[in-house]
């Protein structure tokens, strides 16, 4: 939608991590834990996506650097909530997640009981190599969703806005609303992606896991042939 690469996807990653923290605290593991984490991350991602979308509407032409700075700023907000609010304000049941002082989340959250839940659910072994069928199905479904979405009115509106905002506005498209929706969708999917990524690893550093994910994701997009538009 003419907003360039979304460095603000880091905010979605933070939402995904918060979902996983609550899933671990409530001892909901495996696929149910992933679903719970995703459900928790959705409203957080939507709110963050609306916020960043409205901010970027005020920074037209400078979206990428603005989203990068927003990600840095929101990192401080995330750390404040996780380090100081979880425990005294936001209830955390299990002390194994808390810092020794009694509040704040430990530096590493273990997801051992959730590790590779997607990969193992429909795994097929071929020549001693485990093929994560369900993970591949999810990736294929995401690709099909993108192909379908590009043919919808909203998808066409986003393409039009990305090509020329003024022409899109003259055509009756609500440019600002379309840009906000694109950021919401991007942030929600970033949260899902972070959840899938971290369940594969089996643990995550609470305060740094999200910091580089935006760079890695955008590098993957560029290597895959995406343009900055």
Model-assigned labels for residue ranges:
Residues 1-16, 57-69, 157, 180-181, ...:
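Short, non-helical or kinked segments that cap or interrupt transmembrane helices
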Residues 28-75:
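Alpha-helical transmembrane segments within multi-pass membrane transporters and channels
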Residues 74-151, 205-206:
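Transmembrane helix-bundle core of multi-pass membrane transporters
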């Amino acid at each position: 939608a003419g907003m360039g690469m979304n460095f603000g996807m880091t905010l979605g990653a933070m939402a995904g991590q918060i979902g996983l923290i609550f899933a671990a605290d409530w001892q909901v593991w495996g696929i149910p834990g992933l679903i719970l984490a995703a459900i928790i991350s959705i409203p957080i991602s939507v709110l963050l996506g609306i916020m960043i979308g409205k901010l970027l509407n005020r920074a037209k032409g400078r979206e990428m650097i603005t989203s990068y700075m927003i990600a840095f700023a929101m990192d401080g907000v995330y750390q404040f909530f996780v380090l100081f609010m979880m425990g005294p304000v936001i209830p955390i049941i299990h002390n194994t997640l808390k810092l020794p002082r009694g509040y704040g989340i430990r530096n590493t959250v273990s997801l051992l009981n959730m590790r590779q839940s997607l990969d193992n659910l429909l795994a097929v072994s071929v020549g001693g190599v485990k093929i994560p069928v369900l993970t591949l199905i999810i990736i294929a479904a995401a690709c099909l969703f993108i192909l379908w979405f590009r043919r919808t009115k909203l998808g066409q509106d986003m393409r039009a806005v990305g090509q020329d905002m003024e022409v899109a506005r003259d055509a009756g498209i609500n440019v600002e609303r379309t840009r906000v929706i694109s950021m919401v969708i991007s942030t929600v999917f970033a949260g899902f992606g972070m959840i899938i990524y971290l369940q594969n690893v089996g643990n995550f550093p609470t305060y740094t896991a999200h910091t580089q994910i935006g760079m890695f994701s955008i590098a993957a997009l560029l290597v895959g042939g995406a343009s900055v538009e």
